[in-house]
Amino acid sequence: MAYPTLEKLFHVDRTSDRYENLQHLLQQRISSESTFRTGIYLDSGELFLAIPRELSVLHERVLRRERRVSALWKGLPTIALGAYIRSLILDEVVYSNEIEGVRSTRRDIEIALERARRDTSSLPGAAGKAHAPFAEFAQLYLNLTDNPQQPQSLQDIREIYDSVVRDALDKRDRLGEALFRTGQVVIANKQGRVLHTGVSPESKIEALLTQWIALSQSDSIPETYSALLCHFLFGYIHPFYDSNGRTGRYLLALQLSRPLSQPTVLSLSRTIAENKNVYYKAFDVTERPLNHAEGTHFVLTMLGLIGDAQESLISDLEEKQSSLDELEVAVKQCSNELSRRACDVLYFAAQMDIFNAFRETRLDDVAVWLGVSKPTSRKAFGELGAHDLIIKTSQRPPVFELTPKGRNLLGLM
């Protein structure tokens, strides 16, 4: 029998003592030597995590898959790594938005990032003209590659939230001088049933978020477990009027980037978007009064979603690695007809075709990679164009992609 919720055990108990029996079961779970108690009290009790066999097995499988992900990741060339991580980041932002019903596309996010890169006034805290929506949100995920510091204060959490919603939030939902919302929020479904009532007043929000920070930094609980419990707790607190989900999922990615690989972390929102009902039910089950704030089933569900994300990632990496192996052979066979530099550019463009979100190759990037001037790079692109292997798709900046002939020659059709 799978590890049952306390609520389920209560309902199968037909005796007149079922309330007393439920309290006995609760005490058994919460007082077990293997249980992690948080000391954080919610409306239905102290948030805690029991460690049943199922959870240990799921966690071990996640760690085992991480070894496979890391091995595949380390086998990729630098060009492919950079292109793939950016593609994952674009997807992560798009799918995190989608979960909340906010429409965006990969191209929207890419354009926002490019505008932000060109306009230094779009950096967090800088004054200046407005910039494209989602620029700072996407930049948060890009910065994960630099191992940013975890939130140390309530102000840090607010600043992360501001980056998530800047220029993408209705003015009516923006906060004033207070760090967090001062009014009440109630989440209901289409039928009007209340699904969740956010914590209030603001003083209680601040108190629970202070405990959230302590839990996120605790060295007395495995980091994966604390990250997942913190994800539930942030959703439970619901500290803002809007965009709590996107802020919470970024914070989850930030925390999981310590025990797990970046590719895994950046694949999670897509899996959540594909399993939204499972994801939201995990919150609902944990909040039910008869479950007395046990976080075990939430962690079990999230570990399952992480596992699904890993499986999809591994499959995609293996497929791309196979294409890369065939590509290297194909490029070598072109050396009789093309100059060495043209072959290098072709190899770069082919990697972008496999790993880049838009299959695009920028002349500026190639020049930097080759360590040559832009005119020298342009000459190599011209040689490939003369053989109908590559075509220019943008003048400013100069952007190219493989032609059907080029893709067919390299076995990428």
Q: What residues fall within each predicted segment?
A:
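FIC/Doc superfamily catalytic core
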Residues: M1-M413
